[in-house]
Amino acid sequence: MNNSINHKFHHISRAEYQELLAVSRGDAVADYIIDNVSILDLINGGEISGPIVIKGRYIAGVGAEYTDAPALQRIDARGATAVPGFIDAHLHIESSMMTPVTFETATLPRGLTTVICDPHEIVNVMGEAGFAWFARCAEQARQNQYLQVSSCVPALEGCDVNGASFTLEQMLAWRDHPQVTGLAEMMDYPGVISGQNALLDKLDAFRHLTLDGHCPGLGGKELNAYIAAGIENCHESYQLEEGRRKLQLGMSLMIREGSAARNLNALATLINEFNSPQCMLCTDDRNPWEIAHEGHIDALIRRLIEQHNVPLHVAYRVASWSTARHFGLNHLGLLAPGKQADIVLLSDARKVTVQQVLVKGEPIDAQTLQAEESARLAQSAPPYGNTIDRQPVSASDFALQFTPGKRYRVIEAIHNELITHSRSSVYSENGFDRDDVCFIAVLERYGQRLAPACGLLGGFGLNEGALAATVSHDSHNIVVIGRSAEEMALAVNQVIQDGGGLCVVRNGQVQSHLPLPIAGLMSTDTAQSLAEQIDALKAAARECGPLPDEPFIQMAFLSLPVIPALKLTSQGLFDGEKFAFTTLEVTE
């Protein structure tokens, strides 16, 4: 666990110190004082009464001794409870389909003042240019947008075609950037465990920062070896004992509740007073519809309190201080003298009802954020341009030949989980022996002119129609599932025509589609418009059968080879437990 102060993130000049100390002593006027407020004590439990005094970006003092202190402006909290700004310990903003600018507009008013982001989605498509854009957005954001340098581009060497590489030399060029907190999730855990020098070189280069992990279901000697390499955390745990063992071995546990991967219920009972400094909250992938209707980290805190009886100070601790401490962000995570004034005022702390947000000492106005969004996005110089280098397809491209009596491998989806199971199904003249089997294909979109990789999918709930998307982790080729080759081709051609996006086809017609013009991953629409379009997509998808809650997000992970057990990449069917390609027909 990285508990050291990373001085790179705590810039304060001597003049600022003198001004801050003068206000703390009571010798100078504060910029803001928040009155009529109780501060939730994340360290001891309980509450602290009294004002919060702010000078510039920082808290100058807390407590009743400042009741009569002078200020340029006073904020009446009207009896609210103050907590530190929320921190998402691990996410890919691209998976929200929003730009970093739009994401800030959607989440900052909900109390999300800090994010630790791995932009490996856009880096897989555009390489260093994608990372550079995220850095520009982070530099101009009010929200604290920190970046982990993407470590595995592609996710697993030799297993898929992606749009770009991100070499160690390129990674090192960003290591000392003021918004960089460390090395992003090291997904090639077999390579780390076996001691591959190229991976150890990356770990060594970032060892003074935070090293993110990714090891779903890993245990035994392999888990020990992975941690021994220096990996400090994992957000992929989905079983109670798995999470407990990682904590026992010194890993910090990121409890994830995204739109597809929902692990909070399985892991929440692990959180207690003793281990909460080692526990954090993250979303990984959460779409704008859920953010608008349920919330972001605020939704996770609410569930910890209401459904899992986690004490208030512990729930808010894992949503702020624990994460700040883990990443060496010593200026964040507490409402205390000298800390950055990232403050969330709650009219109801148990329901996480956000009344007002301050970040870097300034109150946030949601309407102002919305009004400035277009100009700030333009200022960031987004990397526009068509990233889909693929000719239209026909139904014959998805033709598969099956022999009666033969057994074939089927990817079995598990609703609301990223892992899949591997099963087999026997083909007869009447079709497969289970009626949930549909077709899946992955088409590379980077000009390699490869034929589609085709396979079988079960458990997804698709009874008719087809879904296609250019969001398919982590290489972001085109993934399509369907009941007929004709409708699969129609869906694929729509997302090609759109320059990337999502599409639902049913009854031989496009029912709904969403263009994603930035890297085939993100829209430039507002969060509200995106939420409405996603609502329409989900409604159209529901007509195709009893699909997962978030069908497109879950579909996007069917091509990610670093999460078990059976996946399909542009290169073919991949066994995520043996870390090797396998055949569609079972011949063993």
Swiss-Prot record:
Q: Which GO terms describe its biological process?
A: adenine catabolic process
Please give the positions of the paired cysteines in each disulfide bond: none
Q: Which domain of life is it from?
A: Bacteria
The stretch of residues making up the signal peptide is: none
**Cofactor needs:** Mn(2+)
Q: Which GO terms describe its molecular function?
A: adenine deaminase activity
The record's listing under SUPFAM superfamilies reads: Composite domain of metallo-dependent hydrolases (SSF51338), Metallo-dependent hydrolases (SSF51556)
**Reactions catalysed, as given in the entry:** adenine + H2O + H(+) = hypoxanthine + NH4(+)
Q: Which NCBIfam families match?
A: ade (TIGR01178), PRK10027.1 (NF007457)
Subunit note: Homodimer.
The entry's protein name is: Adenine deaminase
Q: Which gene encodes it?
A: ade
